[in-house]
Swiss-Prot record:
Highest classification ranks of the organism: Viruses, Riboviria, Pararnavirae, Artverviricota, Revtraviricetes
Keyword match Nucleotidyltransferase: no
Record PTM text: Phosphorylated by host SRPK1, SRPK2, and maybe protein kinase C or GAPDH. Phosphorylation is critical for pregenomic RNA packaging. Protein kinase C phosphorylation is stimulated by HBx protein and may play a role in transport of the viral genome to the nucleus at the late step during the viral replication cycle.
The protein, known as: Capsid protein
Chain intervals for the UniProt region annotation (3 X 8 AA repeats of S-P-R-R-R-[PR]-S-Q): 155-177
Organism name: Hepatitis B virus genotype F2 (isolate Brazil/w4B)
UniProt region (RNA binding), positions on chain: 177-183
One of the record's GO cellular component terms: T=4 icosahedral viral capsid
Amino acid sequence: MDIDPYKEFGASVELLSFLPSDFFPSVRDLLDTASALYRDALESPEHCTPNHTALRQAILCWGELMTLASWVGNNLEDPAARDLVVNYVNTNMGLKIRQLLWFHISCLTFGRETVLEYLVSFGVWIRTPPAYRPPNAPILSTLPETTVVRRRGRSPRRRTPSPRRRRSQSPRRRRSQSPASQC
């Protein structure tokens, strides 16, 4: 199976591959950032956004991978084989997790469209020969819009009418469904 974890978010593994591996912060830094910014939403039993869900999954996968790495470290006798496994996990799996964490944290912080625009512009920049491109790579805005996570469900009723509503307007009434149309 060819599963791309970024597909439903409008990106792709290929699009993220334009960013060099040293671009992504360490897993520890990314986990600290996710915890500092989104702990309440990540620990909430309620669904927030697909990015929150994907971030939760990436964090859980990293935890499972660390459990496996600890088991290998404790049970693999051959130091050379142990080093090979640890290096493989850090190099390959670590990079994939860092990319996933960075992508979803960035989408929550800056907005998905901004992150996608950044990835495309960086991809164009990096593929342009040095003689024809600006000296500095594009940067993801350091002044993000405020991210608001709204819970699903009904909003609390207002006790007073909105100041924008004229008194002469009557509030809209909901149409009642006929019993035949209900399931």
